[in-house]
Amino acid sequence: MKNYSAKEIKNIVLIGAPGTGKTTLAEAMAFEGKVIDRRGSIETNNTLSDNTDIEHEYKRSIYSTILFTEFMDRKLNIIDCPGSDDFCGSLFSAFKVGDVGVFLFNAQNGWEVGSEIQARYARLLQKPVIGVVNQLDADKANFEAAVESIRASSRVKPVIVQYPVNQGPEFNAFIDVLLMKMYRFKDNDGHREELEIPAEELDKAQELNKELVEMAAEHDEALMELYFDKGTLTQDDIRAGLKIGLSKREVMPIFCTSGKRDIGIKRLMEFIINVAPGPLKAPNFLSTDGEEIAADETAPAVAFVFKSQVEQHIGEITYFRVIRGRIAEGTELVNTRTGNKEKVSQLFAVAGRNRIKFTELMAGDIGCTVKLKGTRTNDTLAAPSAPVTVEPIVFPEPRYRAAVKAKEQGDEEKLGKVLNDAKFEDPTILVEYSKELKQTIIQGQGEHHLNILRTRIEKENRLQYDYIAPKIPYRETITKVAQADYRHKKQSGCAGQFGEVHMIIEPYYEGMPEPKNYKVPGKGDMVVNPKTKEEYDLPWGGKLQFYSAIVGGAIDARFMPAILKGIMEKMDEGPLTGSYARDIRVVIYDGKMHPVDSNEISFKLAARNAFKEAFRNAGPKIMEPIYNVEVLVPSDYMGAVMSDLQNRRAMIAGMESDKGFDRLNATVPLAELYRYSTTLSSLTSGSATYSMKFSSYEQVPADVQDKLLKAYTDTDEE
């Protein structure tokens, strides 16, 4: 197998809603390039993609699969991505290293919610797409309706390059209006017969050819002038115009296929080779310094790691794209994150689980290596002489949160390690032990996402665990000024303890004026003026301002750190529910000492109890985390979705309709979002999706606070 240069490589990403035939199309592409001599199928569990046991069980893609094929003396790297939005992290990784998306549509369904979701990701990641109406051999295939739905919903203008002569189970021919030929397929082996367009189809073909010509001319002034001058464009001119339109992400060429029968696959691959942007024409990668990294084969090597995997008997497999230069077996690179050197002992091209040894990979190519030390997804490997770091993948925020509980006592530590290892392969999984909540919290893209992870862990590691409702990281604060004093006094034998602290607390807010001539609540005309100030950004959010207004030596300065420590300890376990307290100003204005018995522990305990008493008298409030939620839903289901959100104490921030879908924005308490993905799927027959991002902390309603206080009291009594 030859080493391919950047001009001989195309990197494509297969995207589309679940069930659009991406894996079957990838299989047909590998067959056409003779990487395999027989096409596998989903039903028989022998495709290059979907090659894991769990994918065989579910009969769907769960992980992205990297494969390649050789065609027209070019190398086509293919990344087959899952259609389910629960596994969208794979698409973000794939589009980081892929230059163009091949966007599949089910000929029976056309544009679906899954299509809308993946189109949004393609727009977000600024990738051009080629449209493929697949499964035209299905019983209810309707090419015209599918294209019309694409036209109605897509922000990128579709243009027909091919249309079927017949469709449904009899589908075996299409007309290519770029080449102005008809192609007919007799067997399911990809062999085609090129024919002239039948007379009864000629008018339609010519009309669509004219639309294609006009679309190509729109994207280039020279082509537009040529079109006005000659009234048409050559095939090469059309390709040139489509190249420009694709690069601008303004046009989506539409093709006809049946991946299952290998109809139209070869022609699609020809178009990708001839028209789709490759490493030299696609936008350059950016470094973390904002500099462009061109695909220059002569420059010092740079490779970007977009996928990490652990395989039994092999260990860690690192998938990367060579961004610049070339990498050969034995090349020594530096991991720019860790500073450690990594030696690439072996190089492979990838075809699913099959790995083909390479001696060298050049700029623009994709491959893998094994047994690197501490390299993971989003790392850059670079020549030590020019250690540039590639801008990392920004993965989507988690949308599902649960607590983890091992079924067998004693499995907690092992389970924690296994869950943390899962993050190595899937960066959209977040796992942490919350000291605050005393739970192991796992976050992912949806309930299905985490259930798949659990199934895999149970089978591979023989560990069983449950997902349970996670506790909510509430916060406590105050709403008014309060004063308290507390004397800690203890006598034990010869040694005693004595410390008395008087304090004022009030709510803190950004930009509030400094305290001057501070009137002490409940102390008549008593006024204090703070002398010193300390300000702390709290690890859990918010601030603490700590002032000393001590005069006349009532409390030695050496005891002030102990007083601060006592306050911080109580803020670490708030007086109401044990949640963190935040956004408070404390002024220590008086106190008493004993010449013998006063010590740090005495003042710490006095401050702790004075703070607790003052807090309870300062209009204490519980605050809850609020999330911005965006729901994308077909218009027919909007009423049910909105009603459900309002039952979750949501505040509707806005709605807008967009090409058959409604986008609803709301702020929702985190406490109301547990298992929301499951409810949303049930309400909309699986046709909606949502995203969520932390917004702020807000006070809970009075009835909710009463319930939380009662629950905490009941737990405390137990």
Where do the protein language model's features map onto the residues?
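Structural and coupling elements of P-loop NTPases
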Residues: 1-718
